[in-house]
């Protein structure tokens, strides 16, 4: 956390991915040329470790689709998750030889890739009304504000130039 200039407040809890740097070193070593995309929900370190907003960290658990706050109960029967620190992911990637090319929302990422054109192309396909509706609903869900559209996409590259 010192590398990022982050100092936790007294009593503040934070989640740290100890396997992040070794994993990104492995990924970068396996990649001669190309992109690494990290897609998940999370924040930059400055936002993530803001004690005013998250004194208790971001760790949450879900049991049968209901959020709980007891990670050491129902072991093996509930999901445990935490938000991604995208500043740490970018920093670890850079140390491993990747260039950080951008961090955007999934909504913007898919839009920039031409999601609207895909939507138009699907409209020209010979699909049933039910299939068309399912495709429309799926596309909307991927970019929905406040939902999956808020996922972050970190784009890192190796030997690809700049955007």
Question: Model-flagged regions — what are they?
Answer:
Residues 1-163:
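Long, Lys/Arg- and hydrophobic-enriched amphipathic alpha-helices
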């Amino acid at each position: 956390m010192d590398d990022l200039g982050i100092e936790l407040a007294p009593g503040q809890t934070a989640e740290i991915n100890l396997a992040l740097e070794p994993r990104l070193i492995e990924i970068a070593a396996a990649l001669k040329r190309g992109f690494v995309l990290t897609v998940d929900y999370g924040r930059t370190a400055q936002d993530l470790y803001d004690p005013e907003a998250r004194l208790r960290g971001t760790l949450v658990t879900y049991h049968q689709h209901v959020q709980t706050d007891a990670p050491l109960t129902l072991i093996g029967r509930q999901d445990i998750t935490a938000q991604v620190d995208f500043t740490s992911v970018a920093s670890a990637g850079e140390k491993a030889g990747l260039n950080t090319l951008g961090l955007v929302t999934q909504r913007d990422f898919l839009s920039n890739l031409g999601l609207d054109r895909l939507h138009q192309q699907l409209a020209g396909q010979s699909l049933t009304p039910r299939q068309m509706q399912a495709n429309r609903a799926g596309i909307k869900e991927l970019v929905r504000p406040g939902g999956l559209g808020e996922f972050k996409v970190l784009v890192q590259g190796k030997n690809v130039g700049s955007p």
